[in-house]
């Protein structure tokens, strides 16, 4: 009889532990979901090539109007300015970015940048609906200059034809040759008599417009941005 009572007590204790553990487990999933939902997405970095003094990360796709595109998911593509555009414009005073819900067309006007009373249009590298706008660059355009391929991104677009759009852009060796041609074109606008060099210690200077007469700014930018 004594052994029987011990067995019953052991079984009862085990059942109690199971019941307590069950209730504890049913109260945990909400906390786990919050952690999962708030987790930052893993950043993907690419090797950065230096082409004629300008940064040109591998793994991105480039529009010949000097905007980059990076696919983030099946149809979502993030867009920004390349290093050439940023260094050409120098200090950006204002940005006019497309609002959420606006439909962009590949190769057509996407946004406008302003400097010193001059306004410069740029072309969208991707067609689709704007689903996100970077508030940081609207508050402080200098963010673009500090990190054009990272925190200085402009907008994200939901593009149903993302893959076919990206095939129209430049990558790899083609992108490098295009960058070299853009730099060569810029050289034609810089008078040798000024004694100014586009590069400073291997990298392009950070305010290329400043070495050009202001009355030529808009013509030079339109030619290079294809706008």
Task: Label the model's feature ranges.
Residues 2-227:
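Contiguous, well-folded functional domains in the mature portion of proteins
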């Amino acid at each position: 009889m004594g052994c029987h009572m011990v067995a019953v007590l052991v079984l009862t204790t085990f059942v109690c532990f199971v019941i307590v553990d069950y209730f504890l487990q049913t109260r945990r999933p909400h906390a786990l979901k919050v952690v999962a939902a708030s987790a930052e997405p893993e950043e993907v970095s690419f090797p950065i090539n230096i082409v004629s003094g300008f940064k040109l990360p591998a793994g991105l796709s480039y529009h010949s109007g000097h905007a980059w595109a990076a696919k983030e998911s099946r149809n979502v593509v993030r867009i920004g300015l390349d290093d050439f555009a940023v260094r050409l414009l120098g200090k950006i005073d204002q940005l006019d970015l497309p609002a959420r819900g606006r439909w962009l067309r590949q190769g057509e006007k996407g946004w406008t940048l302003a400097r010193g009373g001059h306004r410069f249009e740029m072309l969208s590298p991707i067609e689709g609906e704007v689903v996100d706008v970077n508030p940081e660059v609207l508050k402080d355009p200098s963010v673009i200059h500090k990190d054009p391929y990272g925190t200085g991104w402009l907008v994200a677009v939901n593009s149903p034809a993302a893959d076919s759009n990206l095939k129209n852009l430049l990558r790899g060796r083609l992108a490098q040759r295009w960058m070299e041609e853009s730099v060569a074109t810029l050289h034609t606008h810089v008078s040798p008599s000024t004694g100014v060099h586009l590069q400073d210690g291997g990298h392009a200077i950070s305010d290329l417009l400043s070495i050009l007469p202001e009355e030529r700014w808009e013509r030079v930018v339109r030619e290079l941005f294809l706008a």
